[in-house]
Amino acid sequence: MEISKTLLLVVSLVAATCFLQAKAAGVYCSNPYTRCYRKYIQCPEECPSTTAMNSKYKVCYADCDRPTCKSQCRMRKPNCNRPGSACYDPRFIGGDGIVFYFHGKSNEEFSLVSDSDLQINGRFIGHRPAGRARDFTWIQALGFLFNSHKFSLEAAKTATWDNEVDHLKFTFDGQDLSVPEETLSTWYSPNKDIKIERVTSRNSVIVTIKDKAEIMVNVVPVTKEDDRIHSYKVPSDDCFAHLEVQFKFFNLSPKVDGILGRTYKPDFQNPAKPGVAMPVVGGEDSFKTSSLLSNDCKTCIFSESQTEIESVKSKIEYAALDCTRGASSGYGIVCRK
């Protein structure tokens, strides 16, 4: 009986210690371009950890740009109904909170974000059924230019979808790279300015560009239900595996451009018509690049020259941010009351 009491006491102490450790978890804001720089933010008791082996569980997330410097619980997958998202065929939600569609063209690349020190392009795939005036399109790949490096991720083409197969492919500076198919497995670039973390063992990752962006990515197919509802007429040899993406940006310059990037400009006027069910934005010629890893579009401002970067960049004055424009006043910062 005495042994049982002792064992019970030990178990209780261990459990209490684990609880206190979980309760004490938090996030340190290390990005110098965020409002909460060098602050340690406590995690909620409901989600005491920043990681989870089960992707269905919420984790602790501290938005170091928020003036309150508080954490919240969130899923680690793209939210296609929040600012910074690019999902479906393709539907974007800008930094200003406005929904718009940009169809582009199948098998061509377009600038999604172009800043002085960051370029993000998207490759569009799709097809045009007989009798249609335009292509049905989806984002199949992303290309990044950053710190003299080139990085890409893409959804591999497949005729039929299999959840047990990883459809993600990665390259870094022209070389294929492999990220172990294990939940929470991580890859870093040599200088640790790019990080890939698997949220699940297959088809879901978070890419972090140091001090610039966080990108949550899922690979999904065009399902039979999607095909039925939208009359895509998907061929039998391709389920159009594509990306669902949500971007979070830091320290964007006032001159940022690109299909999505320009919606973070402080003075941007979105051409999407309000009140329209599917507001479509054009301008393909302005955003088209010659390849996934090029910065040669008409509106591209990315430069690998530090001199040019400094001439374009301007210091962000957080105190002067205008939160009267809706969801975001620019610079990748979402304003909330």
Enumerate the language-model features and the residues they cover.
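Surface-exposed beta-strand-to-loop junctions
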Residues: L20-A24, I41-Q42, S85-A86, R91-G94
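N-terminal-proximal low-complexity accessory segments that begin disordered
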Residues: L9-S12, P44, D89-P90
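Von Willebrand factor type D
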Residues: P78-K337
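Cleavable N-terminal signal peptides of Sec/SRP-targeted secreted and luminal proteins
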Residues: K5-A22
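Universal eukaryotic N-terminal targeting presequences
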Residues: M1-E2
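Secreted, short cysteine-rich peptides and small extracellular cysteine-rich domains stabilized by multiple disulfide
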Residues: A25-N79
